[in-house]
């Protein structure tokens, strides 16, 4: 028991119940002005949700806050989505049972680690098509891709050559720090033609192990985002129809997709941050050298 200033004792349970009752009395009905302010926000949330059905409240809040410039709290977005049944529920049956034996590589600068993989997509009137992507693990930008009706070594090399021409127009051998390409142990990346091409391009290969589910996690996560945003909500009859929408999606992903791991920056914003940082360092070096010569 606790004794108050009058000498009366009060047990802890009674004190706890009184506190709960006081909190309940303090809760008031939301004002009409506040409710009116929620209307345009809810309209915008529903519009974003219609375009991206599997986006959660954090990503929707980040898009509204950092891409559209709306000053809004994360809890407010969570409340509005919860009141209108717009939240994404977790499927506990899909929880992974494997555990990684070692951590995945962490990229600290662009072009340090690239990830490459393939996924297949079924078209209703055509059959299977194969999507190959190359991802920069630092900026999360898709820098190379190729869509085909097969998944041969040449298809993989086409996507890889696009990535090289995007980031190294003058060739990798003329740049410092050659990228490391992370792939699985499939027949395409382990073929002699692919290994020889990587050696000629100046790319070092890293192969994931069978007992390391996080070995190429960043690249596989991009395919999940692709299927959530584009594949599962649309249907195509012919490959070229998918190709057009896929290229539009890649442009939107690189320029307009906020990433939590990038402090809600887009991939191209993250790349521009490193470019500005390098330019600032070079300017400082030039100033120091000019002062020494003077």
Language-model regions: role of each:
Residues 1, 5, 45, 60, ...:
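Mobile genetic element proteins and their domesticated derivatives, centered on retroelements
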Residues 2-113, 266-278:
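Basic, flexible linker segments flanking DNA-binding modules
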Residues 31-32, 199-203, 225-294:
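C-terminal domain-tail junction helix/linker
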Residues 37, 41, 53-57, 73, ...:
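Hydrophobic (often cysteine-bearing) scaffold residues that line and stabilize catalytic clefts
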Residues 39-50, 70-135, 141, 154-162, ...:
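Mobile-element integrase/transposase regions
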Residues 63, 80-84, 163, 193, ...:
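Alpha-helical structural signal in soluble globular domains
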Residues 91-95, 178-185, 199-218, 234-239:
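RNase H-like polynucleotidyl transferase catalytic core
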Residues 145-146:
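Short hydrophobic alpha-helix segments
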């Amino acid at each position: 028991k606790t004794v108050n200033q009058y000498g009366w004792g009060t047990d802890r349970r009674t004190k706890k119940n009184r506190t709960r009752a006081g909190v309940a009395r303090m809760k008031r009905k939301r004002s009409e002005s506040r409710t009116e302010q929620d209307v345009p926000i809810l309209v915008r949330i529903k519009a974003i949700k219609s375009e991206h059905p599997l986006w959660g409240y954090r990503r929707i809040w980040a898009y509204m806050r950092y891409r559209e410039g709306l000053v809004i709290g994360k809890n407010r977005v969570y409340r509005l989505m919860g009141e209108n049944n717009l939240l994404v529920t977790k499927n506990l049956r899909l929880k992974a049972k494997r555990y990684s034996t070692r951590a995945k590589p962490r990229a600290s600068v662009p072009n340090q680690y690239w990830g490459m993989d393939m996924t297949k997509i079924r078209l209703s009137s055509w059959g299977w098509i194969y999507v190959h992507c190359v991802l920069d693990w630092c900026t999360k930008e898709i820098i190379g891709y190729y869509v085909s009706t097969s998944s041969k070594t040449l298809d993989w090399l086409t996507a890889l050559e696009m990535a090289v021409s995007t980031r190294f127009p003058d060739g990798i051998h003329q740049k410092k720090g050659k990228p490391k390409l992370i792939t699985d142990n499939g027949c395409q990346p382990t073929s002699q033609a692919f290994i020889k091409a990587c050696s000629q391009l100046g790319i070092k290969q890293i192969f994931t192990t069978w007992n390391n589910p996080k070995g190429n996690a960043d690249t596989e996560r991009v395919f999940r985002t692709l299927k959530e945003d584009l594949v599962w909500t649309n249907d195509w009859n012919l490959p070229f129809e998918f190709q057009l929408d896929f290229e539009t999606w890649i442009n939107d992903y690189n320029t307009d997709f906020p990433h939590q791991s990038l402090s809600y920056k887009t991939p191209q914003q993250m790349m521009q941050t490193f470019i500005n940082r390098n330019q600032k360092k070079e300017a400082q070096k030039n100033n120091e050298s000019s002062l020494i010569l003077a």
